[in-house]
């Protein structure tokens, strides 16, 4: 399996990934740090969808690499704006230099998973972000 940008409850808060970084910064009303212009796209797959895709793959006879992810792309600047909105944050977006070797686009082709596993992600980004925000709020309160 090739797994693409999984997020959701249980994710590490300090691993440097966009979703956890943006949510923590937004909840703390700190500037959201954006590498580059923010127009690079990514796709994010909610953890339960990733798990269900892996289970379908394990229960199949399919051989070779299969992409497990969500093909719903979003520009990182739009993701940051959505998180600011969902957290009622006063954070502003601050641009920094682009990361070295940062691809402009990252989106899985999941046609094999759809066609041969009858699998596709079910949790939309807004719902997944809302659940993840609640999880991160709880974790920050524990610290």
Predicted regions and their residues:
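C-terminal substrate-binding subdomain of Rossmann-fold SDR/epimerase-dehydratase oxidoreductases
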Residues: 5, 9, 24-143
């Amino acid at each position: 399996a090739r797994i693409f940008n999984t997020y959701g409850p249980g994710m590490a808060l300090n691993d440097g990934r966009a979703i956890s970084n943006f949510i923590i910064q937004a909840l703390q009303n700190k500037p959201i740090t954006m590498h580059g212009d923010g127009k690079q796209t990514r796709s994010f797959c909610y953890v339960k969808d990733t798990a269900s895709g892996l289970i379908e793959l394990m229960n199949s006879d399919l051989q070779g690499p299969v992409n497990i992810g969500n093909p719903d792309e979003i520009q990182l600047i739009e993701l940051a704006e959505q998180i600011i909105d969902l957290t009622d944050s006063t954070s502003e977006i601050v641009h920094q230099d682009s990361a070295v070797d940062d691809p402009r686009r990252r989106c899985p082709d999941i046609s094999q998973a759809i066609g041969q596993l009858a699998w596709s992600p079910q949790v939309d980004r807004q719902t997944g972000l809302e659940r993840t925000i609640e999880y991160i709020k709880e974790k920050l309160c524990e610290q």
